[in-house]
């Protein structure tokens, strides 16, 4: 494990040495469950790791992770996530939306660009599953599914740059599958988005213990990438075994979030991932049409960078339509309850107030 720096002057050389060890690591197991830190760590290794191949393993607290080019209001129930303190995070890679929780293990394989292969990286996970008695295979969408039921247990995505790439994914061990369904079911209607849409698939848990699966994944990875000549394939773990890894200790680095708090680029990445401008402001442009027969009104919204660009109302009442159109909508963040800003002003007609309440309930 890396040691946190308590005395910068006396520990700088030690910390630098430890950091270099991290960047040369073959396997990194992060004990943090902070999704912002874990994704920032992944990006840090992606940009700085000098290892030919590096495996990163981590678990996140309950979070909805959307792809780089996706619309959170289409992919998730944003209000429910916020009500239940479930993080919504836009990652750097493409692909679809996934739900993370404590029953889920996330993996990321970092490598040189020319060595990228969906099949090769998935085969490592499949072998680890088979070693534990779970029969799985790779389908045509490059998802790992249970061989018998064909239910998805692992989805993946990737990011490729000029020289490096990473292939990362999830593994459903004992996740809250009802949470997956609830948080990834958007209540929004009438949205026409330029963003990438997720493909929904039936999912299932492997019901494996996390420690046992981690152990198998590391062993299979090291063998497959020829990092270790002394590591042997692991048999099914004994229930009495208390050791996490039966491999060379120098092959694996474990770390906590506090170990890297002094790395500026990681802190910067965490702040970016937490920002509204990144999570929602990076949403591809979209339009939404809403209408209420009860109130005899329709509303067309254009949203750019997560903010209202144009709002057009249509209602038989010309005076009401003018009143609604006169409200300064442009530039407001597209958020649940954005119309409440004007409800509290107390200067609108009764009809306009009813419509503003309808808008708040509809977004």
UniProtKB/Swiss-Prot annotation:
Subcellular location: Cytoplasm
GO biological process: protein maturation; protein modification process
Catalysed reactions listed for this entry: L-lysyl-[lipoyl-carrier protein] + (R)-lipoate + ATP = N(6)-[(R)-lipoyl]-L-lysyl-[lipoyl-carrier protein] + AMP + diphosphate + H(+)
Pfam families, per the entry: LplA-B_cat (PF21948)
Residues given in the record as (R)-lipoate binding sites: 152
UniProt GO molecular function: ATP binding; lipoate-protein ligase activity; lipoyltransferase activity
Segments forming domain BPL/LPL catalytic: 49-229
EC number(s) on file: 6.3.1.20
Keyword annotations: ATP-binding, Cytoplasm, Ligase, Nucleotide-binding
Annotated metabolic or biological route of this protein: Protein modification; protein lipoylation via exogenous pathway; protein N(6)-(lipoyl)lysine from lipoate: step 1/2; Protein modification; protein lipoylation via exogenous pathway; protein N(6)-(lipoyl)lysine from lipoate: step 2/2
Keyword field contains Cell inner membrane: no
UniProt cross-references to PROSITE patterns, sorted A to Z: BPL_LPL_CATALYTIC
Positions contributing to ATP binding: 91, 96-99, 152
A GO-annotated cellular component: mitochondrion
UniProt cross-references to InterPro entries, sorted A to Z: aa-tRNA-synth_II/BPL/LPL, BPL_LPL_catalytic, LipoylTrfase_LipoateP_Ligase
Subunit (UniProt): Monomer.
Other remarks in the entry: In the transfer reaction, the free carboxyl group of lipoic acid is attached via an amide linkage to the epsilon-amino group of a specific lysine residue of lipoyl domains of lipoate-dependent enzymes.
Family to which the UniProt record says this protein belongs: Belongs to the LplA family.
Function, in words: Catalyzes both the ATP-dependent activation of exogenously supplied lipoate to lipoyl-AMP and the transfer of the activated lipoyl onto the lipoyl domains of lipoate-dependent enzymes.
Name of the molecule in the record: Putative lipoate-protein ligase A
């Amino acid at each position: 494990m890396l040691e946190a720096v308590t005395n910068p002057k006396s520990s700088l050389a030690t910390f630098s040495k430890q950091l270099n060890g991290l960047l040369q690591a073959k396997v990194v197991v992060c004990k943090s469950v902070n999704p912002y830190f874990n994704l920032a760590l992944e990006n840090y290794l992606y940009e700085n790791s000098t290892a030919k191949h590096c495996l990163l393993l981590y678990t996140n607290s309950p979070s909805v992770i959307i792809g780089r080019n996706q619309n959170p209001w289409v992919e998730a129930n944003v209000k429910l996530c916020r009500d239940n303190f479930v993080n919504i995070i836009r990652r750097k890679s493409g692909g679809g939306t996934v739900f993370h929780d404590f029953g889920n293990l996330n993996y990321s394989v970092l490598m040189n660009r020319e060595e990228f292969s969906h099949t090769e990286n998935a085969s490592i996970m499949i072998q680890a599953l088979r070693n534990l008695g779970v029969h799985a295979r790779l389908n045509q969408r490059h998802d790992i599914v249970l061989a018998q039921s064909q239910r998805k247990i692992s989805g993946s995505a990737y990011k490729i740059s000029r020289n490096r790439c990473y292939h990362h994914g999830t593994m459903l061990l004992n996740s809250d599958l009802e949470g997956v369904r609830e948080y990834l079911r958007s209540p929004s209607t009438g949205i026409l988005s330029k963003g990438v849409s997720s493909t929904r698939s039936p999912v299932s848990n492997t019901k494996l213990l996390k420690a046992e699966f981690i152990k198998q994944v590391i062993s299979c990875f090291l063998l497959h990438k020829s990092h270790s000549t002394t590591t042997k394939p692991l048999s099914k773990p004994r229930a009495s075994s208390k050791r996490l890894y039966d491999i060379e200790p120098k092959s694996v680095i474990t770390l906590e979030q506090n170990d890297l708090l002094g790395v500026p680029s990681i802190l910067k990445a965490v702040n970016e991932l937490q920002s509204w401008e990144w999570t929602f402001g990076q949403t591809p442009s979209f339009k939404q049409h809403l209408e209420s027969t009860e109130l005899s009104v329709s509303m067309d919204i254009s949203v750019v960078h997560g903010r209202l660009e144009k709002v057009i109302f249509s209602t038989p009442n010309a005076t009401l339509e003018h009143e609604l159109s006169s409200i300064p909508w442009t530039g407001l963040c597209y958020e649940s309850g954005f119309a409440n800003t004007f409800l509290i002003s107390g200067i609108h007609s009764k009809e306009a107030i009813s419509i503003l309440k309808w808008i708040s309930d509809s977004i």
